[in-house]
Amino acid sequence: MNNQRHKIIEIAVAVLTAIGKIIFMDILNWRLPFISIVILGWGSYILWQRKHHPDRIIQWGFRTDNWWSVSKRVLPFALLAISSFLVIGLLNNSIQWTWHIVPILLIYPLWGILQQFLVIALVAGNLQDLDEHKQRSGSIIFITSLLFAIVHYPHAWLMGGTFLLALFYGYIFLKERNIYVLGILHGWLGALFFYTVLNRDPFSEVFAKYLN
């Protein structure tokens, strides 16, 4: 298959996955089944590409050689974001103090890595690869951030937060191409955002009906 066509198809399937998130997670409330299928499906695709086209894995950002340099670049932003979440949570009295945050902090980075793979690596990364002259990075980052925000409709705080985060993620990824650091960061920031700003408990939302 033509390489350009392949990248376009990947973008299209990533967008369809985002639409599926709205339908199955937000409308039908099939959170755990949808997350499980997405992780299994896309995880299998990543493993297949790793076996047959290992260079693509590096291109997608599954690499550790620049781990520390990327971590140093995102650390100030992470500290600023966490401080902002806590201030907003204290002002709005929206902080949830519950042990549920512990398992979410442990497992949400896996979902964060997959989200970053779909939105940042496949959409932003492929769009950059298709841009022969590499002159549209700003537009690519904006489009990707807009998509990431729309996926979180209708939650205004979540849409605003993910849009700003994606602007930063997109900028870093197009410079460094490391999905591990961005995915783990997104998982931790996302978990803290739910429990501080949104006053929501994703652990209960996803697992409660299966544990009761």
Label each PLM-derived region with a short phrase.
Residues 28-37, 96-101, 156-163:
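Short, aromatic-rich membrane-interface segments at the entry and exit
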Residues 159-212:
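Functionally important transmembrane alpha-helices
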Residues 2-14, 35, 55-82, 99-108, ...:
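Interfacial transmembrane-helix boundary/kink motif in multi-pass membrane proteins
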